Amino acid sequence: MEDNEYYRINISNTENYQTSENVTTEENAIISNDANEFNMEQNPVVGYSEEPLLPLVKACAPLSNILHDLSTYVEIALNETPEVPPDELTIDESAAIRLYTIEWERPHRSLYSMLNYTLKMADREALRPYFKYLKLFLTALVKIPCVPPLTVWRGVTKNLSEEFPPGTVVTWWSFSSCTTSLTVLENNMYLGYTGDRTLFSVEVINGRIIRPHSHFITEDEILLLPGTHMVVQSQLNPAPDLYIVHLKQIIPEETLLEPPFEGAELYPKIKKHWYRKKRFIIPITFMVALVIAAAIIGAIVGMRSAVKKGKFWMIFKLEVKRLL
């Protein structure tokens, strides 16, 4: 595997970060070293869900003038996809994920590179040519079960600690590839052991394992969806020039990413634990008991009242007879 192929998963390489004016050079970074991209307010990713669900070839047709030799890579992705893909995906859905993971030959930029660059742009109209592919790609991703909550890692070859004080709300607008293996990031080929480095430790709740659908089947890649919303929990500086930023994913109050189809679950369903249910059962049981107790007390009081009234009239009658 070439160096730049693994850079796609794990780190940002400042030397390879390109502007939109130089689209013929591969962007190896999946996280830009420009920290402002994490905090800038963007419009939500919406509109693509209205597109029809098309085969991969047709879904990629609007991108033929954007991505070099796209048809060749689409064919590679389809040929590598088994007839019965895992996770109950269709061939085109699985191939859409596989196409995302393929690295274009240099100096041309890959699909993941151009797509993520466009997702981080403020101009959402620039994203429109990707809508048909996004419909297929995200339909495939949401069919893959979310991994249980776990900690994943990403690395940046720059000190970004000052940009992430505790309590800061962070949104990653691109598809974000992470690894569960910290030893991968320690490899000298990627982050290395010297120079400014920032490690992001992220507690994720809706990551997807795409290894069964990846062009690189040896990569344990966890993919986060656009609009991943997080809060900075803490920071750590365990070694010179090494900074660790602890992030915790939260569900945003507003829609940042439109689901690809009606009923699609971007986040795992929250299961109510027994002790939470008990919080509601106990007050209801208590109220029912109060009503029953009140009814019993009322009946007893009524009987006593009736007894007292009966005794009064009996005495009254005896006194009347005595007087007569």
Kindly give the residue locations of the regions a language model identified:
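N-terminal-proximal low-complexity accessory segments that begin disordered
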Residues: 27-28, 33-74
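Intrinsic disorder
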Residues: 147, 179, 196, 223-226, ...
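Conserved structural-core and active-site-/substrate-pathway-adjacent residues in large, well-folded domains
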Residues: 153, 181, 232, 273, ...
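Alpha-helical transmembrane segments in eukaryotic/viral proteins
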Residues: 281-310
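Extracellular/lumenal N-termini and interhelical loops of multi-pass eukaryotic membrane proteins
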Residues: 308-324
